[in-house]
């Protein structure tokens, strides 16, 4: 059977956890392929709400194997705390598999992340301060420490000792911060190693065998397309590649295994942190979207910036990811608005453009060109079929399909597992 990719088509927080959980009932493995604990997703099952940061949403399905792939950077303390929290709520975490090739977030990564962000002042990126960027930086510089190094205390000690010679010089002499103590870190991570060892595996091999045996594998990205380090609004991006092209690499499987790429897209637009946002609403409407949609970060708690749907970035996401389907979320949040504008292009110095500007300078100056659609006032949270939606809501979905360039195959009308309309089967 083929692999499926689930990717955020905006700036993250699109509702990937809900989509993954829904699809989890039809898949055998759910693989997180990039990012770290700088992002979170929420899954609501009945009266229970689960906030996950590192563990794939597939953990909440008893017949699904959750996998943390080699493209992820892992803070073992955070991972174990998340595992313990799920265990306390009756979730069996023994199924979790962790790639031996994934990189570890170390104390010096967190320290450097925080101090560099403070040093940048007004030019700061808006990092979560969890060490994600410095960890990916060391991975590329070939000075990183991997999960497999936890299995060999001698190798772990040698690698860390060598790395800390440089990192402590930077912390102490450049930023006037306390040095990281080698022995303290070695002791801390030795405890992590004991607990994580049963979960460490050659996940690429396991996934390849599963696919050959006819199993269905879902590859789950974190963040979103516009936060991709290559294709996003650089430098206001994450340090990895959430886009679909990295899914195979970050999971350890071949790209020809992938047959479908599903883009998760919110019925309006949100963004956390700094960076350009053409449709942003700095008014009461924006505040209302934030309040009704509960737009506060799962990981940071920060209020998300809100705006109307931007079809230009949606078209861009369809293009760079090769999206075959869209999963539209939070349509219910728009109930009650008299009008629901869609940004269909940008005004750049008096000239209309319909595609993503080539440069970030242009994108910073892009002004949205809207087409207005009538809104609806009905509560749609209990609707379970497309045919039963209000006419204006159906027209809105059709317009999003037309302007985005991909079919909407599922629609979320609330946070619950069952609050979804399936238009086209995704698995």
From Swiss-Prot:
The keyword Ligase belongs to this UniProt entry's keyword annotation: yes
A single GO cellular-component term on record: cytoplasm
SUPFAM superfamilies on file: P-loop containing nucleoside triphosphate hydrolases
Reactions it catalyzes: IMP + L-aspartate + GTP = N(6)-(1,2-dicarboxyethyl)-AMP + GDP + phosphate + 2 H(+)
Superkingdom field: Bacteria
InterPro entries in UniProt: Adenylosuccin_syn_GTP-bd, Adenylosuccin_syn_Lys_AS, Adenylosuccinate_synth_dom1, Adenylosuccinate_synth_dom2, Adenylosuccinate_synth_dom3, Adenylosuccinate_synthetase, P-loop_NTPase
Residues binding GTP, per UniProt: 12-18, 40-42, 304, 330-332, 412-414
Family: Belongs to the adenylosuccinate synthetase family.
Protein name: Adenylosuccinate synthetase
């Amino acid at each position: 059977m083929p692999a499926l990719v689930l990717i955020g088509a905006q700036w993250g927080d699109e509702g990937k956890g809900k989509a993954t959980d829904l699809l989890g009932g039809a898949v055998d493995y759910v693989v997180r392929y990039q990012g770290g604990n700088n992002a979170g997703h929420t899954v609501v099952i009945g009266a229970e709400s689960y906030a996950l940061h590192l563990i794939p949403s597939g953990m909440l399905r008893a017949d699904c194997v959750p996998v943390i792939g080699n493209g992820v950077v892992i803070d073992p303390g955070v991972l174990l705390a998340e595992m313990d929290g799920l265990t306390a709520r009756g979730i069996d975490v023994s199924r979790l598999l962790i790639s031996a090739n994934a990189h570890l977030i170390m104390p010096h990564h967190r320290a450097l992340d925080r101090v560099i962000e403070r040093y940048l002042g007004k030019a700061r990126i808006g990092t979560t301060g969890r060490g994600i960027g410095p960890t990916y930086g060391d991975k590329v510089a070939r000075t990183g420490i991997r999960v497999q190094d936890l299995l060999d205390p001698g190798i772990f000690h040698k690698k860390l000792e060598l790395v800390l010679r440089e990192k402590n010089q930077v912390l102490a002499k450049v930023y006037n911060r306390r040095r990281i103590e080698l022995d303290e870190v070695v002791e801390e991570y030795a405890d992590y190693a004991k607990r994580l060892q049963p979960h460490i595996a050659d996940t690429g091999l396991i996934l390849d065998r599963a696919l050959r045996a006819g199993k269905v594998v879902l590859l789950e990205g974190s963040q979103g397309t516009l936060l991709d380090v290559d294709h996003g609004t650089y430098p206001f991006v994450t340090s990895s590649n959430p886009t679909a092209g990295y899914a195979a690499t970050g999971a350890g499987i071949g790209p020809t295994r992938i047959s479908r790429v599903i883009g998760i897209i919110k019925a309006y637009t949100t963004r956390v942190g700094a960076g350009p946002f053409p449709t942003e609403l700095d008014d009461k409407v924006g505040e209302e979207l934030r309040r009704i949609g509960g737009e506060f970060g799962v990981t940071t708690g920060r209020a998300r910036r809100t705006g109307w749907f931007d079809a230009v970035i949606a078209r861009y996401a369809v293009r760079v990811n090769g999206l075959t389907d869209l999963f539209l979320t939070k349509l219910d949040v728009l109930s009650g608005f008299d009008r629901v504008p869609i940004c269909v292009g940008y005004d750049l110095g008096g000239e209309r453009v319909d595609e993503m500007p080539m440069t970030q300078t242009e994108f910073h100056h892009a002004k949205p060109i809207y087409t207005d659609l009538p809104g609806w006032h009905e509560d749609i949270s209990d609707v379970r079929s497309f045919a039963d939606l209000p006419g204006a809501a159906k027209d809105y979905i059709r317009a999003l399909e037309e302007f985005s360039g991909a079919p909407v195959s599922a629609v979320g009308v609330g946070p619950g597992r069952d609050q979804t309309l399936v238009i086209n089967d995704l698995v």
